[in-house]
Structures are given as structure tokens and as C-alpha cells.
């Protein structure tokens, strides 16, 4: 980055310091990951210069013959990864992928059944402060209070009562496997469409480690980062059942409906990431993500930290801090101060406000990319517990900092940057 260093020292320094943060801290935010240098090279390429409104072979600009190749490669690889008949890789984010589906099949005020945000859902699944909750009439389903798992019978009853046009499955803070087949059965019973937002688990689905929603859902949306380990972006997929009826409508909803020109440098980076995800090495990586999450959860429980639902089936864990008399806000700050990055997160039936919360969410995708295994999960679990139990003990916290530094030095990040 010699040109940037000379031309804009302020931005260069911000990037340099962020690289240092990623190298020196243990990244446990469940929605984050470390992409390959090949993905970063594609995203930082000359494709950022090219406007390409439209779709391959149907552009509103000339000179698109090479960006067409990149987009076709991305679409073909995504179809292969997930067994989809239709793919749109142009959404700039997961939120815009969701918006594209909503705009395709819903009218203002239509009823939609989605997961309660505090039970693990997402802002775009009907939060009243989000466009989804403003534009449409969302009703909520959630988890049982006793075991914190989705209550499918309650989902069925809510669907029968409210007769939604669309049911949304998928979550941003739900640590258990979701039964998409059961969701489709419920949708069929009430004549609703089913959309699955698999943003958090897409990499696990691609590796065959979680039920694939594509055969069951009318529409599947995802981000391309998180467990899929690509650039930040979104994507829509459909199976053969709905591709013929809705493919062109979905394309029009994205462009010209809610977006203009696609980000061709990001789409190229998506293509690279999808190629990586097709490899045997990625399958091994995804298996390790889950093994690490399970091991970390077991260690935290052994250290006396409560885990929502008692464990995990995927990459994330939700910690209930009430028994430690801590809030998520306090815990996030304390952990960050010793070099462990997490995020405060509401737990089901949380008595605290959304900016305070009673929990923190952690995930293992990024640390697994770094090379951490189950032995490192034991140490991280111990370090988290030590921190949470000794928030005012500076001697104990300094010991944690030293151990974090030793651990991160053992597994260097981006040594060539």
C-alpha cells in the first residue's frame, strides 16, 4: 500500500491500525471472518472502475465483456455450491437481498411471520425500526422459554392464526440447527411462501454440515461473508420450483428496483470465495468451525458460564451473563480491553434494554480461519471466564492480556501484508 501511504497517510494509518487489531486480538464476533488474500486482491482490483447496470449479456453499458465473465463465474459456482437453479449475486448486502425478495412478492401491509429479534432473528425480519417492520405487518414467533429452541408447533399455530403471505426462517443469534423442511410444511399448510435467510450458516450449508434450505424454500437469501468466508455482500438463490416463475421478477427487484450498478469488484471477490468453498479444504475448515464452537461451549459451561440452549449445533454461542451479575455491555467492554472481541446481544426473554442486554454472542469462524483448534478453544474459554469473573482485578486481567498476546503470536494473521 505504498501509494496509499504516500497520498493519504490518515486512511493508511487507519487501515494499518485495523490490521494490527485483527492480528493482535482474538476475533469472536460471530458475523465476522478473515478472507483469503486472493479474495482481497479481487476486491481491490480494477473491476472497481467498471459500471455494469443490468445482467451478463443484457447490460446498459458497453465494455462489460470481462465483468460478465466474473459475474457468470460467481453465479455458476454458487449454483454448484448450493444446488440452486437461480442465483443473483448483485445484492450489496444481506439486507438488500431480503428487500429484493420482499419487493418481489409482497405488497405494502402484507402479513409476514418472522423470528423475534431478541430470540435470535434479524432486523430485516420485521423489527419496527427497520424497513421490513415499517413496510409490512410482521408477526413474531420465537423459542420456548424452557429450552430456548424454536417452538415449531407455536410457529404452526401463529401461521394458522395470522395467515401470512410469507414466512421467514433463519436467524442471526440462534445456535441450533433449523428444520427448514418443517418450516416448508407449515408454509404449505397456510398457503404461504417460505424465505430462508441463511446468512450465518451459509458456509456450513455449503460444506454439507447443515440442512440445505434450497430444496425447501421458495427463496433463499444470504450474505457472502460470515461462515462462507467471502467479501461483504449478499445473494439470492432459488430452486427449480420457483426459478422459472420468479427469476426475472427477482432480477428486476434488485435492478432497477432497489439498486443501480452492481459492485463488480465485490462480485469478482464473491466468485473467488465460492471457488474456495467448493474445495475439500473448505469442508475440513467448516467441520472445524463446529467442533471449535462445541468445545468452546463445553469449556465455558465447565467454567460456570451459562450457554443459551445448553450448547450449539453451528458456529455460534450465546452466553447468558445473568448468573455472573453482568450485562452484555459491561462484558463486551471488559473482554475487548483484554484483547477478546465479542458483541453484546439480547438473549431470549431478556429483561435488559437492547443496548445493554444480558448476553454476548460469540462465534468460531474467524478463529478457525486463523488456525485455532480445540486446544485453543479450551484456553479461550478459560480466558473469557477469568475476565468475566475478575472484571475489577487488574492483576488477573493483565495475566489474560499476556496470554492473549502469546496465543495470537503463535497464529500470525496476514504475514504478507
UniProtKB/Swiss-Prot annotation:
Tell me which domain of life the UniProt entry assigns to the organism this sequence originates from: Bacteria
- What keywords appear on the UniProt entry? Amino-acid biosynthesis, Cytoplasm, One-carbon metabolism, Pyridoxal phosphate, Transferase
Per its database record, what is this protein's job?
Catalyzes the reversible interconversion of serine and glycine with tetrahydrofolate (THF) serving as the one-carbon carrier. This reaction serves as the major source of one-carbon groups required for the biosynthesis of purines, thymidylate, methionine, and other important biomolecules. Also exhibits THF-independent aldolase activity toward beta-hydroxyamino acids, producing glycine and aldehydes, via a retro-aldol mechanism.
Q: One Pfam family name from the record?
A: SHMT
Q: Where does the signal sequence lie?
A: none
The protein's assembly and partners: Homodimer.
* Residues engaged in binding (6S)-5,6,7,8-tetrahydrofolate: 117, 121-123
Q: Which residues carry this modification: N6-(pyridoxal phosphate)lysine?
A: 226
Q: What is its EC number?
A: 2.1.2.1
The biological pathway it contributes to is: One-carbon metabolism; tetrahydrofolate interconversion; Amino-acid biosynthesis; glycine biosynthesis; glycine from L-serine: step 1/1
**Protein name per Swiss-Prot or TrEMBL:** Serine hydroxymethyltransferase
Give the reaction(s) catalysed.
Answer: (6R)-5,10-methylene-5,6,7,8-tetrahydrofolate + glycine + H2O = (6S)-5,6,7,8-tetrahydrofolate + L-serine
- What organism is recorded for this protein? Shouchella clausii (strain KSM-K16)
Q: Where is this site: Plays an important role in substrate specificity?
A: 225
Record localization:
Cytoplasm
Q: Does the keyword Glycoprotein apply?
A: no
Q: Which GO BP terms sit in this record?
A: glycine biosynthetic process from serine; tetrahydrofolate interconversion
Tell me which GO cellular component terms the UniProt record holds: cytosol
Amino acid at each position: 500500500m505504498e501509494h496509499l501511504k504516500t497520498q493519504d497517510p490518515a486512511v493508511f494509518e487507519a487501515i494499518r491500525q485495523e490490521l494490527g487489531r485483527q492480528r493482535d486480538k482474538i476475533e469472536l464476533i460471530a458475523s465476522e471472518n478473515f478472507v483469503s488474500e486472493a479474495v482481497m486482491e479481487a476486491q481491490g482490483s480494477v473491476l472497481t472502475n467498471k459500471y455494469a447496470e443490468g445482467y451478463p449479456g443484457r447490460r446498459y453499458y458497453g465494455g462489460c465483456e470481462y465483468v460478465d465473465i466474473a459475474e457468470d463465474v460467481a453465479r455458476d459456482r454458487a449454483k454448484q455450491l448450493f444446488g440452486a437453479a437461480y442465483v443473483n449475486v448483485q445484492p450489496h448486502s444481506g439486507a438488500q437481498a431480503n428487500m429484493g425478495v420482499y419487493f418481489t412478492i409482497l405488497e405494502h401491509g402484507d402479513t409476514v411471520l418472522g423470528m423475534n429479534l431478541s430470540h435470535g432473528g434479524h432486523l430485516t425480519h420485521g423489527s419496527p425500526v427497520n424497513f421490513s417492520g415499517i413496510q409490512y405487518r410482521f408477526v413474531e414467533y420465537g423459542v420456548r422459554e424452557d429450552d430456548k429452541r424454536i417452538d415449531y408447533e407455536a410457529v404452526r399455530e401463529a401461521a394458522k392464526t395470522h395467515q401470512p403471505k410469507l414466512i421467514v426462517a433463519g436467524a442471526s443469534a440462534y445456535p441450533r440447527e433449523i428444520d427448514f423442511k418443517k418450516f416448508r410444511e407449515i408454509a404449505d399448510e397456510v398457503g404461504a411462501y417460505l424465505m430462508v435467510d441463511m446468512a450465518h450458516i451459509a458456509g456450513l450449508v455449503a460444506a454439507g454440515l447443515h440442512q440445505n434450505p434450497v430444496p425447501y424454500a421458495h427463496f433463499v437469501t444470504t450474505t457472502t461473508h460470515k461462515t462462507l468466508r467471502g467479501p461483504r455482500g449478499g445473494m439470492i438463490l432459488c430452486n427449480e420450483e420457483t426459478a422459472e416463475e420468479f427469476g426475472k421478477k427477482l432480477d428486476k427487484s434488485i435492478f432497477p428496483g432497489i439498486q443501480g450498478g452492481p459492485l463488480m469488484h465485490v462480485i469478482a471477490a464473491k466468485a473467488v470465495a465460492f471457488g474456495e468453498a467448493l474445495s475439500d479444504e473448505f469442508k475440513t475448515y467448516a467441520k472445524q468451525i463446529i467442533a471449535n464452537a462445541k468445545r468452546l461451549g463445553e469449556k465455558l459451561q465447565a467454567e460456570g458460564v451459562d450457554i443459551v440452549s445448553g450448547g450449539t449445533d453451528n458456529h455460534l454461542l450465546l452466553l447468558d451473563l445473568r448468573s455472573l451479575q453482568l450485562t452484555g455491555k459491561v462484558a463486551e467492554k471488559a473482554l475487548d480491553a483484554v484483547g477478546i472481541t465479542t458483541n453484546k446481544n439480547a438473549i431470549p426473554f431478556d429483561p435488559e434494554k437492547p443496548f445493554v442486554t444480558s448476553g454476548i454472542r460469540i462465534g468460531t469462524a474467524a478463529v478457525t480461519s486463523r488456525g485455532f483448534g480445540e486446544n485453543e478453544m479450551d484456553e479461550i474459554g478459560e480466558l473469557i471466564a477469568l475476565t468475566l469473573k475478575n472484571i475489577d482485578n487488574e492483576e488477573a486481567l493483565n495475566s489474560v492480556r499476556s496470554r492473549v498476546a502469546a496465543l495470537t503470536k503463535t497464529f500470525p494473521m496476514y504475514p504478507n501484508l
